């Protein structure tokens, strides 16, 4: 989520067949929902625009490679090569890891840090998605492209959520336009 901006239930639904190393993209085509009585249900993403391709960079490829190596070490090489298996699975080899498990893991890490005197405010896995979006904008990423990566249904939604990141935008853009007209005669 921190490197892709994906929703947690999109990550938990991710299969090795969704990883396209030829075109360097992750195909987001499904999400995991948890039934009220327990159990997993695979569904289509929450909106038409949630079904999307996310570009992969080298960091994402390294994370995926380490995950594949971890699965091979714990569950065997044959299991790790199955294209229809989930990328992130439970310790017992179950099909998908629960989003609650991710939250529990975050809480455990924060607890261990507190024991070492390092206090970090509690956060949820959605903070990784927000951090991705914030850093993307801070690094000059285009808002329309961010909308597509995040799978938002409208540009307005993306702008409403993340425009606070750009407090000096008007000033910066006036400088850019000034630079564009440097040396041009003014009438």
Label each region the model flagged:
Residues 1-32:
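Short, charged phosphate-coordinating catalytic segments
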Residues 4, 54, 70-86, 91-148, ...:
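Short, basic (Lys/Arg/His-rich) helix/loop patches that form interaction surfaces
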Residues 18-25, 141-161:
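Short, polar N-cap/turn motifs at the start of nucleic acid-interacting alpha helices
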Residues 21-30, 37, 66-79, 115:
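Proline-centered turn/helix-capping motifs that create local helix->coil transitions or kinks
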Residues 23, 34-51, 58-60, 73, ...:
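C-terminal secondary-structure termini that scaffold catalytic or DNA-interacting sites
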Residues 32-34, 131, 150-176:
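Catalytic-site neighborhood detector that most strongly recognizes the C-terminal catalytic loop/helix
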Residues 58, 62, 66-69, 104, ...:
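Generic recognition of well-ordered alpha-helical segments
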């Amino acid at each position: 989520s921190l490197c892709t901006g994906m929703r947690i239930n999109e990550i938990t639904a991710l299969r090795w067949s969704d990883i396209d190393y030829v075109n360097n993209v992750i195909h987001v085509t499904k999400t995991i929902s948890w039934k009220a009585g327990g159990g997993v249900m695979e569904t289509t993403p929450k909106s038409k625009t949630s079904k999307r391709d996310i570009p992969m960079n080298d960091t994402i490829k390294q994370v995926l490679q380490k995950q594949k190596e971890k699965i091979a070490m714990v569950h065997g090489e044959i299991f790790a090569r199955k294209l229809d298996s989930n990328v992130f699975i439970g310790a017992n080899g179950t099909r998908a890891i629960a989003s609650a498990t991710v939250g529990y893991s975050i809480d455990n890490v924060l607890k261990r840090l507190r024991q070492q005197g390092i206090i970090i405010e509690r956060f949820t896995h959605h903070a990784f998605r927000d951090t991705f979006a914030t850093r993307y904008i801070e690094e000059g990423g285009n808002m329309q492209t961010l909308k597509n990566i995040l799978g938002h249904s409208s540009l307005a939604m993306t702008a409403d959520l993340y425009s606070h990141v750009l407090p000096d935008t008007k000033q910066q853009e006036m400088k850019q336009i000034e630079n564009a007209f440097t040396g041009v005669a003014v009438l």
